[in-house]
Amino acid sequence: MTHHIVIGAGLAGAAAAYSLTARGEDVTVLERHTPANDRGSSHGSARIFRYVYPDRLYTELVVRARELWDDLEAKSGTELITRTGAVDFGDARHTDLLAEIFEDVGVEHEVLDQARAAERWPQFAFDTEVLWHPDAGVIDAETTVRTMLERAVDTWRARIRTDWTVTEVARRSAGGFSVTSATGESVEGDRVIVAAGGWLPDLLGDLDLPEGFVDALPKFEVRQEQAFHMPYRDADADGRPSTPWPTFIHKSGEMFTYGLPGGRDAGFAGQKFAQFNGGKVIGSALEQDGQITDEMRTRMIDYAKRYLPGLVPEPYAETTCLFTNTPNEDFVIDEVDGLVIVSACSGHGAKFAPLLGEFAADLATGAGDVPDRFRVGAATT
């Protein structure tokens, strides 16, 4: 039986382990901290699940991913996505194009003018017409990681090693790989899947990749995003809103903002929102400092006052999160000589988690392929 080593226990790594063990493969997951820890991109209880993309490929992939989410929820008996619906608006959001893609793919949706949208969602101050799709929601990222890893371990085919910092991935002369930790421990396996997120830039030099493959990789940009929660103005005694809140994306010439109902980390008592790619650029996850800036806090307070009248503009539960971006925001999912890379996801990968795991497992086992756009391309051919 093939033994796979998965580096990283965030959403992508956990999904890879889950998919591989479901196929009868053996897996060791190596995590430098703990699964879904707050120094990565998969922590907390609130990530957006949405179908909206100005690109038909991604919308079609969300439809495929949703089937896998439903299957995971059914098998685990755990709700991982809370259905809230989503609104998209703003003069740079091009709701007509998005609605056309929805029509082609078959995603339920509705386009509302400003007046009708304001009547339905008085907690927003819309500046354009609005695209609504009811099947969007909020992903509990931390619970998803835990659930996928538990399912993998329950097969007796997976081991999880925590506080295990990878320092080298070397090819063995007899075939396969030897992965070494900062403490000198080693794990041997036949295949390696790297799902390291913001740590990938530091790992690249330690992966024993062919030169042509490395040269063909896009430039990775790691950002430390800043997110804020603000209380609901119509909150009950527990802080819960009396008016249901959808997730939202607001894209204007001024700023690209996204938001969603906050989860456990915010006591379910506020809307979480942030400026997309508004955080500072850092070399890798090793350089993060977790700091919230006064400039960004003020910017988001001003935004709430202008566009979110249903919130009290007083931030709480402030947090940071890492985005690992490619120049065109496409994913990088590829295999070369027994090593699979599943990163970067450019800040929009959470909704695809179980599908990313399927892609990784397909490449590692040779059972399938991935969209050509996600392949490194020039690689070793």
Give the predicted meaning of each segment.
Residues 1-12:
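Beta1/beta-strand and adjacent pyrophosphate-binding region of the FAD-binding site
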Residues 46-120, 127-129, 254-257:
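Dinucleotide-binding Rossmann-like beta1-alpha1 core, especially the glycine-rich loop
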Residues 167-187:
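Conserved beta-strand-loop-beta-strand element in the redox core of flavoprotein oxidoreductases
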Residues 90-155, 159-162, 168-175:
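Flavin (FAD/FMN) cofactor-binding and adjacent substrate-gating region
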Residues 5-7, 30, 187-203, 357:
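Short hydrophobic core segments
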Residues 21-41:
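Glycine-rich FAD pyrophosphate-binding loop
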Residues 299-381:
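C-terminal catalytic lobe of FAD-dependent flavoproteins
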Residues 18-22, 79-81, 198-337:
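Active-site substrate-recognition segment that forms the wall
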